[in-house]
Amino acid sequence: MKRSSIVLGVALGILTGVAAANEETELTPVERGEYGPIDKDTSTVLYERPIQITDRVYSAIGATQPETFENFGHNNNLTFVIGDEAVLMINGGSNDELAAAMHEEIKAITDLPVKYLVSENGQRHAVGGNHYWKNQGVELIGHVDAADEVEHYGGQYIEATIRQRQDENYPFTLVDFDTLMEDSIRLDLGGIEVEVRTYGPAHSPGDVSVVVPSDNLVIAGDLAFHIRMPPIFDETDTAGWIETWDVFEQEAGDMLILPGHGGPTDMATVRAGTYDYLIFLREQVQALLDEDGTLEDAYKIDQSAYAHWHTFHELAARNAGRVFTAMEFE
């Protein structure tokens, strides 16, 4: 009887261990904490409160992971520049609640009004909270291509926000930009002038960067990546992105770089995280095309060298497939 009890106990222990292992493997990389805490600061809807980047620039660094209910859609950087007379905000946030929380953080640092808001592109986390800022009298600025993106995908943005907030009645209103730009625009904040410009095709239509010469800083937006794998969309022109990079590096090589995701870094780091990855992926796809490889082969390209990047599991195979599909017709 005692021997049977021991055997039964061992068996139950093994089964419990297997069940626990299975449960662990069913968790997503986000749930396993592979991309950092699921929510870094539970005292605010922001994933993280703003930190000082340079003398005049602060940024609330968003989660380098897909959006979740817990991170409130704060998975990009929400940045602001303080002049002597006014403040420039970069990115409206995913929703009005994030925007309002960000505004409170700004008011805790300066009494100056937010005069301008620049959306780094037309993605939801860049424009979703613009409704709040417009109601504060802030001038909304975006690229003409970003405006087209919002018009085209607006319905999907509403649906995605409702899913992310898990509330069918969650208030979400998209608004138009007040000022549309193409190549560049200069903004006077009093005491300093910043340039909002496009370096060329990059990650998403309408991608713009903000150059702050006084602080030797480029708020690069989604032109540059490092800790997070660059997402490649159906409309992403990877060949154009590589050409754009040459211009970007030539002009901003000695400047501090604040990407759209992740903290500030230098040009060498974002080059490795962006340009080198694009070159690698295109070379791998070209080798497949030369051998009459298929889309299925593209999905299997070995990208394990980049497995340490956040969102690798979500994006690696998808990126390869999209590059393959695009290069078939180049």
How would you label these PLM feature ranges?
Residues 1-7:
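Bacterial N-terminal signal peptides that target proteins for export
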Residues 60-76, 150-152, 227-238:
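Acidic/histidine-rich helix-loop elements
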Residues 84-88, 96-141:
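Active-site metal-binding motif and surrounding structural segment of the metallo-beta-lactamase
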Residues 55-105, 210-212, 217-221:
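Conserved beta-strand hairpin/beta-sheet module of binuclear metal-dependent hydrolase folds
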Residues 52, 86-88, 94-96, 147-199, 213-214, 244-245, ...:
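Metallo-beta-lactamase
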Residues 15-17, 22-40, 250-252, 264-330:
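Accessory terminal helices/loops
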Residues 7-17:
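Bacterial N-terminal signal peptides
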